[in-house]
Amino acid sequence: GHLLVEALVARGIDTVFGVPGESYLAVLDGLHEHRDRIRFIACRHAGGAAFMAEAQGKLTGWPGVCFVTRGPGASNAAIGLHTACQDSTPMILFVGQVASDQRDREAFQELDYRQVFGPGTLGMAKWVGEVHEASRLPEYVARAFHTAMQGRPGPVVLVLPEDMLTTATPAPVLPSIQVAQAWPAPGALIELRRLLLQARQPFVIVGGSGWTAE
């Protein structure tokens, strides 16, 4: 859990949102340990926490981070995840999961999150990953940030089995990603300018992601 928190801090995350749950107690312990560098905003409902993370991502252009527990925590966060997908907002939803040795045994509130949030949902998340080796946790976090930011921004779900958060590992925190900025081709901008100048009553709807001060 501490390794995950350190990976978030290394990527410039100073605020995360969530509803505390027993499925990711090790992360909460890490957040408390590093409370001078990262703030955990405890919410009363997972849907509200997801919306806060979505707003954070939308306003900053860097992934908003939300932690929820398994089962109802994840399902309640779905509305915020869907909003992030529809609005092209970078966001990462971390979901607690039953321990690996309890999978497929009808453990308490166990769900298959690749089925819940995966491609078959048509607009819920860009990628759903689940950590199966504690030593690969930094790799999964790095991929989550990369996927959320590259191309069309959007939400990512990373599932955290309990034992993956409590297993000691010497794995180092991976460096932060460098996001490639997408720009229109010069020819397309010239054509856009020509069309606007020719228009008698130009009307522009400005929205979506990727807008900066420049």
For the regions a protein language model found, what residue spans apply to each?
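N-terminal alpha/beta PP-like core and its mobile active-site loop of ThDP/TPP-dependent enzymes
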Residues: G1-E214
